[in-house]
Amino acid sequence: MFGSVGETVVDLYAGIGYFTLPYLVKAGAAHLHACEWNPHAAAALRKNLALNGVADRCTVYEGDNAKVAPARLADRVNLGLIPSSEAGWPVACRALKSDKPGMLHVHDNVTVTPATAAANAEGGADGGVPVPATYRRTEAELTAASLTARAAEIAAALTR
């Protein structure tokens, strides 16, 4: 989020402003395009933007991201939806500027395999032992590889 001074940001799952407001109030985004399908959340977002004095730097789009999200204008796109934002990845890629590299902030839950969970639970009555850093790194690398492969598929589909 930080390092977005002067940037145009798209927040695909804006809600009431969990990420929208910090981008505008603290991180210095020039303009943010906030997409939200829930009209009650969108109304609360508008109120929160006004209360924080940044409503003039945010455009709120109500509806399905695939239909309302802007295209080819973002320096970065936030996908703050869990357990997975994968359904929004193609929309996010379309939102990025086409003339320069951009940044996608992908939110996703990482799961632990049953075997690993069982091994950790054997650590004692306190619920297990800490997961070794090497395991966390391996899980992160596998997740990153999966995300990279999926992003390449989406990018290829967008150029067709």
Question: Locations of the language-model features?
Answer:
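Short glycine-aspartate micro-motif
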Residues: V9, L32, N78
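Conserved SAM-binding loop of SAM-dependent methyltransferases across substrates and taxa
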Residues: I16-A29
